[in-house]
Amino acid sequence: MSIEAIGEFQRGGHLLNANGFQNAGLGIWQPCFTAQRALRAAAAGDASALAGVNAGDRARCAIVAAQRDYSYWVESSDFFKLRSLSVSYDVPKRFTRGARNTTVSFAGRNLFVNTKYSGSDPEVADQRTSTFSRRDYYNFPPYRTFLFSVRTGF
């Protein structure tokens, strides 16, 4: 049996989570639901609705974009990823009649990500941004892929 794994980490990077910024303004970002309900009630005249909403939630979840704080949405893009893992097993000859050798293999890519980044993936970058700045704006993370193979020699 053989096992091969490739991991990768990044530390010290930052990324603008424009998805969170945009979705908060649209009212479809779940962590803002409670704060936005209170902000809407206050705008309709119920000032007591703001009792449980702190200043951070007001800046992060404001419905009007000009009132939202962009700096809240710049997040650490530190991560550890298991880029690939492959496992191969040489099947004993007693199980493979007529074959000289048989190897069964499994491989996977992008199997695991450990990050505190709240967006889809800490490595995504909008194609419209330069190489000097990055933002996550409705991009797809890398696909998780799997491979299974059987190799037989006669």
Predicted regions and their residues:
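Repeated loop/turn-to-beta-strand initiation elements of outer-membrane beta-barrel proteins
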Residues: 1-5, 95
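Extracytoplasmic gating/loop element in the C-terminal half of outer-membrane beta-barrel translocons
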Residues: 10-103, 108-109
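C-terminal beta-signal and terminal closure region of outer-membrane beta-barrel proteins
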Residues: 31, 38-50, 65-67, 114-154
